[in-house]
């Protein structure tokens, strides 16, 4: 049974702000000193050693919490104190609490959603909601016996309460620093803070706060929203600022944290201070920004073909770029460089979008004084010298992919020519966008809202030092979940969702970003992503295309906390997810393979038809069955991974793709073709060339490896859905077998847009992610002299890729935008003999007369068998078929490095009797005479 009691004088105590004691406050000059210390923290009152720090209870709303209290408890109380000084030792009396509020066990209501399912126990309720000031101090839930002794006690996860008590009034608040009518307004959401001061630095633009004076201005809180504000009757653009936040940090104490603004629009170098910016200021805009227009190349998702690119990779080693701009945003503004000529050629062929790896302010690259390691004199193709040199400086060097968010709304400073100039960062980023638009390419951003680089009191933690325990997803003990790699954010929390959505709006509206790729999107709620879609569309007046990694894992797996933005769950939303079905079937094995698993072969890499040494002794019947299974998943991918598209499986049985199996789940999982992203390579894991280097037989010659690369690219470009290519995939890019080059420096991430040089064989890949696979990698790298792609090999793949891009651009049959159109037009044909040959037919005669593909007919064949294959397809008989006109330049005799030729292509035929013949390791696209004339 639960007892109730009130502490005498409770009403009077609640009327005073918790933590408002004057003795806790240092003098103003001391606060100025804290202002001048980046990520400074002063403990005002230490955490009591007798106060439990874990948080095994969770607020459901502002009145109810869930906790597994001991069954023998006579009463359960909420203990409150202005500082973390509560003494709750098991077997002793509860002490140090300024207030005790009775909690009553109540039936578990139906509205306790999945968000709190990670915390077990019963539901307890207060009689009345706490006043706003109660959330500013320390609190415990305590179970007492009949004599008032502590049986158990724990901290309480606070997000549910803050969402109920403050978020309704705060969700529409304008946060950050804004200039309105000559007045600069600062706003920060921090409902658990007991005091906040604004640090306003006297001089703009300086890197070192210590060099100038600072004003400390008290901010005022709105009790309903928890938003702290301060207005200055002046236009403060260019001025640096920070906040001093007095807040209780579990396990640490009442702390004064010096933090930057999570809603910063500008920063100085290394994110020491936030900078007041107006994104409409001409100083933030390159010349011609007002007239910038995105290319009108994409009407729907399926028109998109994306090239995934890292800003530094693009130009760091391009000697045609001015030295000061190499590795910078401004490299894209030089149209006559090797990189821009290459991108423009891809755009002319049909590439629609560049997707940039993270470009927000990231935590892992010094924006000043980064170092670049020298290549050791003894570095060789198969030794560890180069990776050791990189490893010695990798935490201080100039390279990282950037999946380490620090501030979400500010361009990364290491890509700017002067990271201390906040307006310049913005101007140079916009100049990059403008230059890509002028080259015929839309611009997408890879965004990472699923985690931050640090949490808690870490130096590069921001959110958790302002509202501890709110912005990050917690486990059953109250520790931050890290399944993404780092500190998982809780986008199911109202104000974290607000931050994510408003951040995306800033990039789409103010930087004219055309699409977004969401890293680990499955860790975000579907509802938040739908709200984000509505917000970016409304802010820009156009459709902003969203796609992301819909992987299902971690603490949110299978909807444990909410309906995820994951594969299958997003059906019907128009938000696309990457598909691993065709990717794994084509490459062999699974993403992240290590050791002997790197020899597992797939449809592209020699399964059954070209066994490598590890697979040479396997029974042919076994490998043929595996190839049939892989080929079934190839058809799944080519058909857009649609749930209800029907074709034959590995056993020849006609069934919907939802009944094809991929691991433990369905292979087909989307409801519309625009909801799937097809790829065979991206920044993660081995490049396609490197994967094939490990999986194909070692004696496979380079010209055959080039043909396999073309087949891998063809799978992407002939498939229904969104096409996705990794930068350099069209040039046989290698990372010298590095499976995870996020922190491997410039050398392993090298790309040469002319194709003349390759990173293959520069050395064993870095030990920190690859050493367990060195025994499998070393023999391959030892043959670098014969396996390193040559200029002619890269050119062959590049010209083939551009031809396939042109075919996709010109053929609406390859970009069908509805499930009904795909179901009506596409069919696959069974082939004679062994698997290894895929024949697809697209017949536009089945489409409505108003459809742009109506009446057109197209067939394609993909042969992964090294031998010539032929098959009779009765339904293709009775027509005059010809190879697609865009393939003719590749058929011509002769050839050179600049204009390579495919000597086998002329042998690809589809005759009027329906007899199709295609050379080994080849792709061909055929159209009818009538289609050609249209």
Language model features by range: what are they?
Residues 312-333, 344-512, 520-541, 545, ...:
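Substrate-binding/active-site clefts of carbohydrate-active enzymes
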Residues 188, 243, 309, 356, ...:
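Conserved, mostly hydrophobic/aromatic
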């Amino acid at each position: 049974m639960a007892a109730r009691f009130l502490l005498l004088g409770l009403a009077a105590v609640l009327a005073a702000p918790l933590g408002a004691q004057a003795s806790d406050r240092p003098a103003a000059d001391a606060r100025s000193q804290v202002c001048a210390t980046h990520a400074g923290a002063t403990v005002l009152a230490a955490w009591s050693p007798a106060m439990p720090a874990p948080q095994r209870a969770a607020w459901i709303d502002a009145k109810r919490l869930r906790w597994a209290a001991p069954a023998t408890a006579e009463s359960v109380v909420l203990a409150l104190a202005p500082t973390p000084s509560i003494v709750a030792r098991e077997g002793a009396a509860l002490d140090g609490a300024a207030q005790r509020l009775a909690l009553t066990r109540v039936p578990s209501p139906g509205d306790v959603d999945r968000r709190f399912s990670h915390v077990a126990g019963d539901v307890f309720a207060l009689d009345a909601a706490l006043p706003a000031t109660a959330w500013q101090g320390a609190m415990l839930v305590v179970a007492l016996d009949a004599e008032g002794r502590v049986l158990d006690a724990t901290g309480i996860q606070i997000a549910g309460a803050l969402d109920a008590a403050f978020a309704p009034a705060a969700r529409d608040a304008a946060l950050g620093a804004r200039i309105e009518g000559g007045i600069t307004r600062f706003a920060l959401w921090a409902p658990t803070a007991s005091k906040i001061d604004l640090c306003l630095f006297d001089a703009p633009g300086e890197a070192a706060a210590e060099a100038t004076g600072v004003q400390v201005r008290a901010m005022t809180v709105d009790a309903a929203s928890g938003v702290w504000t301060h207005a200055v009757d002046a236009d403060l653009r260019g001025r640096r600022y920070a906040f001093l936040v007095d807040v209780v940090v579990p396990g640490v104490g009442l702390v004064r944290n010096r933090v930057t603004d999570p809603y910063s629009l500008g920063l100085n170098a290394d994110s020491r201070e936030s900078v007041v910016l107006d994104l409409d200021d001409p100083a933030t805009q390159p010349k011609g920004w007002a007239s910038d227009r995105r290319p009108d190349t994409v009407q729907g998702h399926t028109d998109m073909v994306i090239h995934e690119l890292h800003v530094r990779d693009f130009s760091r080693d391009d000697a045609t770029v001015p030295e000061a701009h190499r590795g910078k945003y401004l490299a894209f503004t030089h149209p006559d460089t090797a990189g821009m000529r290459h991108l423009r050629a891809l755009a002319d062929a049909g590439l629609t979008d560049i997707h940039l790896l993270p470009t927000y302010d990231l935590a892992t690259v010094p924006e000043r004084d980064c170092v670049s390691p020298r290549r050791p004199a003894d570095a060789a193709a198969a030794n560890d010298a180069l990776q050791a040199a990189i490893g010695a400086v990798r935490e201080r060097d100039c390279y990282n992919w950037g999946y380490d968010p620090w501030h979400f709304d500010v361009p990364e400073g290491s890509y700017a020519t002067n990271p201390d100039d906040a307006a310049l960062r913005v101007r140079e980023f916009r100049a990059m966008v403008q230059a890509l638009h002028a080259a015929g390419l839309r611009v997408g951003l890879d965004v990472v809202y699923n985690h931050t680089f640090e949490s808690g009191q870490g130096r590069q933690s921001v959110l958790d030092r302002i509202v501890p325990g709110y912005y990050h997803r917690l486990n059953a003990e109250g520790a931050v979940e890290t399944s993404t790699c780092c500190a998982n954010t809780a986008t199911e929390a109202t104000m974290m969702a607000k931050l994510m959505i408003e951040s995306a709006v800033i990039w789409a509206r103010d930087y004219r970003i055309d699409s977004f790729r969401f890293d680990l999107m499955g860790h975000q709620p579907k509802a938040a992503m739908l709200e984000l879609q509505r917000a970016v569309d409304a802010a820009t007046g156009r459709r902003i295309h969203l796609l992301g990694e819909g992987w299902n894992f971690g603490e949110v797996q299978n909807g444990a906390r909410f309906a995820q933005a994951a594969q299958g769950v997003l059906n019907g939303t128009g938000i696309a997810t990457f598909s691993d079905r065709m990717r794994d079937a084509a490459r062999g094995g699974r993403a992240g393979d290590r050791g002997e698993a790197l020899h597992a072969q797939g449809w592209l890499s020699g399964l059954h038809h070209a066994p490598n040494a590890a697979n040479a002794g396997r029974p042919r019947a076994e490998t043929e069955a595996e190839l049939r299974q892989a080929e079934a998943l190839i058809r799944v991918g080519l058909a857009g991974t649609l749930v209800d598209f029907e074709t034959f499986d590995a056993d020849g049985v006609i069934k919907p793709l939802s009944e094809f199996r991929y691991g433990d789940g369905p292979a087909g999982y989307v409801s519309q073709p625009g909801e799937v992203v097809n790829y065979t390579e991206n920044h993660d894991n081995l490049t396609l060339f490197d994967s094939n280097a490990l999986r194909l037989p070692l004696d496979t010659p380079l010209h055959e490896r080039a043909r396999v690369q073309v087949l891998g690219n063809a799978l992407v470009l002939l498939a229904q859905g969104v096409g996705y290519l990794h930068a350099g995939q069209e040039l046989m890019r290698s990372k010298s077998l590095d499976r995870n080059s996020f922190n491997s420096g410039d050398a392993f991430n090298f790309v040469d847009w002319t194709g003349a040089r390759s990173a293959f064989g520069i050395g064993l890949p870095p030990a920190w992610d690859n050493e367990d696979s060195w025994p499998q990698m070393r023999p391959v790298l030892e043959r670098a002299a014969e396996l390193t792609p040559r200029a002619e090999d890269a050119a062959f793949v590049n010209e083939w890729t551009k031809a396939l891009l042109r075919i996709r651009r010109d053929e609406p049959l390859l970009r069908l935008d509805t499930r009904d159109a795909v179901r009506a037009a596409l069919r696959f044909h069974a082939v004679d003999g062994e698997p290894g040959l895929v024949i697809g037919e697209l017949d536009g005669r089945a489409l409505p007369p108003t459809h742009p593909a109506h009446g057109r007919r197209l067939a394609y064949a993909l042969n992964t068998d090294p031998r010539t294959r032929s098959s009779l397809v009765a339904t293709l008989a009775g027509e005059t078929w010809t190879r697609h006109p865009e393939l003719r330049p590749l058929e011509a005799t002769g050839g050179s490095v600049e204009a390579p030729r495919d000597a086998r292509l002329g042998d690809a035929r589809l005759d009027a009797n329906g007899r199709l013949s295609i050379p080994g390791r080849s792709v061909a696209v055929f159209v009818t005479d009538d289609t050609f004339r249209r």
